[in-house]
Amino acid sequence: MADDKFNQVGVNIAEKATMIWNVADALVGPFKAHEYGLVILPMTVIKRFHDCLLPTHDAVLKEYESKKKFAVIDGFLTKASGYSFYNTSRFTFDTLLADPENIEMNFRDYLSGFSENVQDILAKFEFDSVIKRMVDSNTLYLVIKEFNSQKGYLGPDKIKAVDCGYIFEDLVRRFSESFGEEAGAHFTSRDIIYLMTDILLSDADLTKGGNVTVYDMAMGTSQMLSCMEERIHELNNDIEVTCFGQEFNPSTFAIAKSDMLIRGGDPNNMRFGDTLSEDQFSGYQFKYIISNPPFGIDWKREEKAVKAESAKGELGRFAPGLPKISDGQQLFVLNGLSKMAPQGKMAIIQNGSPLFSGDAGSGPSEIRRYIIENDWLDAIIQLSTDMFMNTGISTYIWVLNKDKPTHREGKVQLIDASHCYEARRKSIGTKRNDITDKCREMVAQAYGEFKDDTIYGEKDGIYCQSKIFDNEEFGYSKIVVERPILGEDGKPELKKGKPQPDSALRDTENVPLKEDIDEFFKREVLPYAEDAWIDKKKTKVGYEIPMTRYFYEYQVPEPVEDIVARIHTLEADIQNDLKELFGEGE
């Protein structure tokens, strides 16, 4: 179903995207292959806007002339253009090409005529420096000419907004793949996104109309938002989906805002800034949150702002605790939780660190405790390694839900989908594996059935496991076990009648929350240290989620006899080979 989106009625998405990408033929030499997108992406945006505005071009110019002395004229011009953007320049692509001697000056004049929302996009693309490179290499005229040809036509009479969105998405994918790992940091492939959307929407009642809000706190090029919107409309096309996103990288923000404009959405919902230190959606609440924030990245740049907000307690986003400064991914989880509506649901990608890093009482453990004790942790899905373009490590989808169905209350589902993939024919960066449609259906089935089970695929080696746990399973009490200082007579030294602890003999034990601490102490400690006691003032509660331990499968080692026999066989084969070799030499 996902792939069908690239075969729309009236226009073949991949074919059109290929035709546009082939404009790169004019860039060979002055631009390296991984730089083609620096020209093609902004030019695609500009040409789409140009072709949309062309029918109302004269009307906009007339309205501009009559209203240009007004303090505020945006409303008049957007009404005249019929879009949320406009252009007041007298130039079109045709008239630009009619004057090749002044192509740079006229093209810059044309770009300066765009409305402020488009100007913001071009500034974030840093397109001015790209124009200079094209001028210096005598390619600007050729590029404009190529985009003004039939293959570069992007008017709404031939290409619907949704189709143009998919064309642009395909171009973004090509750019990301050609750029390798750096761009991959901002691009999550569709197979992963579709799994996340299917999990988010698995229990959704979308039979009625209305409005649904979707938020991505680290949206990159906004592919997660567009895929989520697509999935919701597949279930009910009458639902109005409003997308919101924030991004800190200028070029990927430009792509995201362009995509929103191209699709006919509200570009004001795409906002620039650092989510951790410059929250652009303070006070907002969303039905769905889907995100792949950076992991393993420090938050030193945001430290001052984050700690100041943490000091506000429940008035801020980071009251439960702060992770170590070297890894800020849990801060994004807290940001998402603060923006989840009472019936909200979130799917967010993390690496393995948030599962277990930090001792009892530490920031990471307190964040896990906050999530689990509020019964918001719905499921964690382990993906295969080599799923992303820029990292080969294991990754996990955390599913959080503030409105769990009754049968999921007080429970957490762990799904090991690390064997649920198929190898790609050709890797892209470090992405060597794909979640196929069938694999995605298996994981969605496991999530929906909510039981201890193993689901097997049609091909050998493809399966996913599901296990259900009580919330308390992941909690423990960390107790401090003391033993006394012994005097020369072998008896404990006393102070005010109490034995004094020997710091050299001090130890700790993690007692599962489901166990009685005193019973554990009697069973596990006193038989080996009868003079020990618990310093109950130092007891702390911690939480960890040891996925590997829960899904560990014991492999019976090969019998020693079989190993020895195999060695003897190999030795005999080597001896025979040597005899044949030297026998021929004689």
Could you tell me what each predicted segment is?
Residues 389-483:
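Flexible, glycine-/basic-rich loop-and-beta segments that form/coincide
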Residues 183-291, 295-307, 330, 351-353, ...:
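Conserved S-adenosyl-L-methionine
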Residues 26, 35-36, 40-45, 322-400, ...:
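Conserved Class I SAM-dependent methyltransferase catalytic core
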Residues 1-204, 269-280, 382-385, 409-416, ...:
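Non-catalytic, mostly N-terminal accessory regions of nucleic-acid modification and defense proteins
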Residues 226, 254, 291-293, 330-334, ...:
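Feature representing long, continuous alpha-helical segments
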Residues 266-270, 311-316, 345-354, 418-424, ...:
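Short acidic (Asp/Glu) and glycine-rich catalytic loops that position anionic groups and cofactors
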Residues 233, 261, 265, 294, ...:
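Hydrophobic alpha-helix feature that most strongly marks membrane-spanning transmembrane helices
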Residues 298, 302-326:
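Conserved catalytic motifs of ABC-family nucleotide-binding domains
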